Design a protein with these regions (language model features):
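Amphipathic alpha-helical dimerization/coiled-coil segments
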Residues: 1-7, 25, 81-110
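A cross-family signal for key residues in well-ordered alpha-helices
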Residues: 13, 25, 57, 63, ...
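Charge-dense, helix-prone N-terminal extensions
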Residues: 33, 62, 106-110
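Conserved catalytic core of two-component sensor histidine kinases
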Residues: 50
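Beta-hairpin "wing" of winged helix-turn-helix
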Residues: 58-68, 74
């Protein structure tokens, strides 16, 4: 049996790498040319950065627009917001329960 990755899985995958998170932070300040992003990572070069951009694009986190030979990268924060809100909503009851237990333990120790 083969696991089918959901769109949420693609977003979590995209967020799972420090370089991709830095690209997201940089794009949060506004669209950037691919060349500008390549300069952030001289150790992996253009090919490496393009692979990271592909992962972010696959998750819908960034959109690439071409103007002639220039590639402009734009952030779309909505997929990140959506997947995080969904995850928190799914786990909030367990988090609240753990917080309540922790509070009771702390009160007993006082």
């Amino acid at each position: 049996m083969t696991y089918q990755f959901s769109h949420d899985d693609l977003i979590w995958k995209a967020l799972g790498d420090a370089r991709r998170r830095l690209i997201i932070e940089v794009l949060a300040t506004g669209p950037k040319q691919t060349g500008d992003l390549v300069q952030l990572f001289p150790d992996i070069g253009r090919t490496g950065v393009l692979k990271h951009i592909d992962v972010l694009t696959e998750g819908g986190i960034i959109h690439v627009r071409r103007e002639g030979r220039t590639r402009w990268n734009h952030l779309d924060p909505e997929p990140i917001r959506s997947v995080c809100n969904s995850w928190v909503a799914k786990h909030i009851d367990g988090i609240k329960s753990s917080a309540t237990k922790l509070k009771l333990i702390a009160e007993k120790e006082q």
